[in-house]
Amino acid sequence: MERAQSDWNIEIKRRKIAKKFYKEYEIISILKQLSQGLFFLQKNKIAHRDIKPQNILIFPNNIYKIADMGEAKEIDKNKMQMATLRGSELFMSPLLYEGLKYNKKNIRHNPYKSDMFSLGLCFLYAICLNLKVLEYIREMTNMNNIKNILEKFLDTNKYSDKLIKIVYKMIDLDENKRFDFNELENELTQF
């Protein structure tokens, strides 16, 4: 069994204290690694359901892996849209968060696209080194508002438009417009 050096949340906090922003190639490397793992799960009809920086472990040589499969669930294709509420509130997709707010037990949603939203928020946190950005996004009701908020937090000189557009597609409020892991994998082949 491998032993992780840290988790991504701890690393992001270290970088925030040191004011050491991720370089684009680092973000892309991490994104590719995590996308491959989550694409594998999606291909095998498994949704993680609790993606957050604390559940992303860092191993030697900057290898990032998804961990804590305690909330993971095999998804029946016929019932894919109906799922119980799982996940960490700050990293929940809009549909799951709405269900939590209104105390709903089951929510109609695509669990892979909910995982994608959670992963997108992890990357926003890493890119901005600021958890506040996630709190602001939680209150947004349309993508234009999100883009306006992110302009205040993102240093667009550090990251290409291409990368920013990928992150936007990961956190699109409309799950029908949001990437799944197959689509993200295809997009990442262009980097």
PLM regions and their residue ranges:
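Conserved C-lobe activation region of Hanks-type protein kinase-like domains
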Residues: 99-117, 121-155
